[in-house]
Amino acid sequence: MTKRVLVKFSGEALAGKEGYGIDTKILKFIASEIKALVDAGMEVAIVVGGGNIIRGVSAAADGIIKRTSGDYMGMLATVINGVAIQEALEHIGLEARLQSAIDMHEIGEAFIIRRARRHLEKGRVVIFAGGTGNPYFTTDTAATLRASEIEAELLIKATKVDGVYDKDPNKFDDAVKLDTLTYEQALTKDIKVMDDTSIALARENSLPIVVCNMFEEGNLLAIMKGDMSLCSIVK
């Protein structure tokens, strides 16, 4: 059974049906899914996006806001989401620590890898916010980077679909689920698992990536116990 895992949630997933902001019902659901992992003896880290609040690329689309500033705005959005997830985890009795790549001492700790590992060893959930701390990098890349740094055995990308498909299953009825694919296939066949930087970094560090449906209760724990029928895996 996998011991240490990093779970990546998109910011959009927190928004629920409204499409923006934070749905506390989804926060509660995420917290309960993470608690199941912790209760099973696993060490859990989280990275969350910020798309429910603002996306850097979109903010900079018309040229008024520079891309670098737009990306920093997106990083701040991930901190907001990180605080929300921390509150939800603590509400159900878990210990959680927020570490930000952008210093915000009043809100969370600075990102320090040794401290993050120590938190995990003590059974605390660590939420990594602020992306990588640099513009032009996605939160998917941040998730792969942090997972590599904490020496996670698995990176789970929790999405709205149950895996990776050869084309968009929401648009094409004949879309085929790909249960297993290599890093090279993900890169060369333009299959949208994560961006190329994320995939390349995962390949370099031999970090398996699992893509699954975050809205199915019990999915995360079942996958961590070895049920790969619920997901797609890139390795």
From Swiss-Prot:
<keyword id="KW-0963">Cytoplasm</keyword>
<comment type="function">
    <text>Catalyzes the reversible phosphorylation of UMP to UDP.</text>
</comment>
<feature type="binding site">
    <location>
        <begin position="132"/>
        <end position="139"/>
    </location>
    <ligand>
        <name>UMP</name>
    </ligand>
</feature>
<feature type="binding site">
    <location>
        <position position="159"/>
    </location>
    <ligand>
        <name>ATP</name>
    </ligand>
</feature>
<dbReference type="GO" id="GO:0005524">
    <property type="term" value="F:ATP binding"/>
</dbReference>
<dbReference type="InterPro" id="IPR036393">
    <property type="entry name" value="AceGlu_kinase-like_sf"/>
</dbReference>
<feature type="binding site">
    <location>
        <position position="50"/>
    </location>
    <ligand>
        <name>UMP</name>
    </ligand>
</feature>
<dbReference type="InterPro" id="IPR001048">
    <property type="entry name" value="Asp/Glu/Uridylate_kinase"/>
</dbReference>
<keyword id="KW-0665">Pyrimidine biosynthesis</keyword>
<keyword id="KW-0808">Transferase</keyword>
<feature type="binding site">
    <location>
        <position position="168"/>
    </location>
    <ligand>
        <name>ATP</name>
    </ligand>
</feature>
<feature type="region of interest" description="Involved in allosteric activation by GTP">
    <location>
        <begin position="16"/>
        <end position="21"/>
    </location>
</feature>
<feature type="binding site">
    <location>
        <position position="71"/>
    </location>
    <ligand>
        <name>UMP</name>
    </ligand>
</feature>
<comment type="subunit">
    <text>Homohexamer.</text>
</comment>
<feature type="binding site">
    <location>
        <position position="55"/>
    </location>
    <ligand>
        <name>ATP</name>
    </ligand>
</feature>
<dbReference type="GO" id="GO:0033862">
    <property type="term" value="F:UMP kinase activity"/>
</dbReference>
<dbReference type="InterPro" id="IPR011817">
    <property type="entry name" value="Uridylate_kinase"/>
</dbReference>
<dbReference type="InterPro" id="IPR015963">
    <property type="entry name" value="Uridylate_kinase_bac"/>
</dbReference>
<comment type="pathway">
    <text>Pyrimidine metabolism; CTP biosynthesis via de novo pathway; UDP from UMP (UMPK route): step 1/1.</text>
</comment>
<comment type="similarity">
    <text>Belongs to the UMP kinase family.</text>
</comment>
<feature type="binding site">
    <location>
        <position position="51"/>
    </location>
    <ligand>
        <name>ATP</name>
    </ligand>
</feature>
<keyword id="KW-0067">ATP-binding</keyword>
<dbReference type="GO" id="GO:0006225">
    <property type="term" value="P:UDP biosynthetic process"/>
</dbReference>
<protein>
    <recommendedName>
        <fullName>Uridylate kinase</fullName>
        <ecNumber>2.7.4.22</ecNumber>
    </recommendedName>
</protein>
<feature type="binding site">
    <location>
        <position position="165"/>
    </location>
    <ligand>
        <name>ATP</name>
    </ligand>
</feature>
<keyword id="KW-0547">Nucleotide-binding</keyword>
<dbReference type="GO" id="GO:0044210">
    <property type="term" value="P:'de novo' CTP biosynthetic process"/>
</dbReference>
<keyword id="KW-0418">Kinase</keyword>
<keyword id="KW-0021">Allosteric enzyme</keyword>
<dbReference type="GO" id="GO:0005829">
    <property type="term" value="C:cytosol"/>
</dbReference>
<dbReference type="Pfam" id="PF00696">
    <property type="entry name" value="AA_kinase"/>
</dbReference>
<feature type="binding site">
    <location>
        <begin position="8"/>
        <end position="11"/>
    </location>
    <ligand>
        <name>ATP</name>
    </ligand>
</feature>
